[in-house]
């Protein structure tokens, strides 16, 4: 276990903007890049991707903030090997500013931990969400990258954070249930004017990941009018399971493992693509998501 330390970050004393401030204005207040990792279903590796992506972004000296957006039952601190003295509940309860909850994670990244077992924080009311987004925007200005690990599902708090972020990364696996839930999440984001970037996890081959992404994009394009672009595939890799069991991110514990290499490639793409755009595909049907993927 690492000994967590509070990170001294100056807090702006400017008056808070009114609750009517919209998400677009909050997003413009962020100087660095912001990524939200979202999934429609739990158990697809979302938190693991968020943690390891944050660490991959930090490899070249970037200042990275990792936010556990599952405020009621997150696990970012566990995967980082931390036992923080404070978490986001202290801020939401008014005990300290948002920066006062930060701990130092692996490679010096800043980690904003969530609470554990606080059911009252699973969904924040509108004024609290507005306050959080404003303060998170202020805090994010001090970092080159902010990576937010969102709760699974389609709650209002998670959706607000997904809309706030510049780049929503939608994670799924080839599992039919995961694909169906990912499609539902993409549909909600599309209704709010956002097209996520797709990452397919736990693929047996690169061809399998590409085929899953093609079918997903075809279905989304036909029904939603916007197709998520495939931004990466992550292989099924025992190194990821071993690292999780040891509470050690795999990009640190197994830097040469195939999954670590792919996460670094994803981080590189995020850093070099100024304005990533989704791609258009021919029309399709939702049932196309569940057709078997041919063997490579």
Where are the model-predicted features located?
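Conserved C-terminal guanine-recognition region of P-loop GTPase G domains, centered on the G4
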Residues: 179-193
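G-domain G4 guanine-recognition motif of GTPases
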Residues: 40, 173-174, 196-211, 233-240, ...
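Beta-strand-loop-alpha "switch" segments that mediate conformational coupling across diverse proteins
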Residues: 224-251, 263
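NTP-binding/hydrolysis catalytic cores, primarily Walker-type P-loop NTPases
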Residues: 247-296
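P-loop/Walker-type NTP enzyme "switch/lid" segment
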Residues: 39, 66-141, 238-249
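Extreme N-terminal, non-catalytic leader segments
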Residues: 1-44, 55, 62, 96-100
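Inter-motif core of Ras-like GTPase G domains
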Residues: 138-141, 155-176
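Hydrophobic positions on the alpha1 helix immediately C-terminal to the Walker A/P-loop
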Residues: 49
């Amino acid at each position: 276990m690492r000994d967590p330390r509070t990170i001294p970050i100056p807090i702006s004393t400017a008056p808070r903007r009114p609750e009517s401030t919209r998400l677009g204005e909050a997003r413009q207040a962020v100087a660095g890049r912001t990524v939200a990792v979202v999934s429609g279903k739990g158990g697809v590796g979302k938190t693991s991707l968020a943690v390891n992506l944050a660490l991959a972004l930090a490899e070249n000296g970037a200042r990275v903030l990792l936010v556990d957006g599952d405020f009621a039952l997150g696990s970012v601190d566990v995967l980082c090997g931390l036992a923080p003295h404070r978490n986001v509940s202290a801020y939401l309860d008014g005990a300290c500013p948002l920066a006062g909850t930060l701990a130092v994670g692996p490679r010096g990244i800043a980690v904003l931990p969530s609470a554990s077992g606080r059911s009252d924080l699973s969904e924040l009311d509108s004024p609290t969400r507005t306050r959080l987004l404003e303060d998170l925007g202020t805090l994010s200005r001090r970092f080159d990258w902010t990576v937010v690990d969102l709760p699974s599902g389609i709650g209002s708090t998670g959706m607000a954070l997904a809309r706030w972020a510049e780049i929503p990364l939608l994670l799924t696996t080839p599992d039919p249930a995961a694909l169906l839930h990912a499609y539902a999440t993409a549909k909600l984001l599309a209704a709010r004017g956002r097209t996520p970037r797709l990452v397919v996890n736990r693929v047996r081959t690169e061809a399998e990941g590409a085929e899953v992404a093609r079918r997903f994009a075809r279905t989304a394009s036909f029904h939603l009018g916007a197709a998520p672009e495939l931004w990466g595939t992550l292989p099924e890799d025992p190194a990821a399971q071993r690292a999780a069991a040891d509470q050690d991110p795999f990009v640190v514990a197994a830097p040469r493992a195939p999954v670590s290499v792919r996460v670094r490639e994803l981080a590189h793409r995020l850093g070099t693509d100024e304005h990533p755009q989704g791609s258009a595909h021919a029309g399709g049907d939702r049932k196309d998501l569940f057709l078997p993927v041919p063997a490579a």
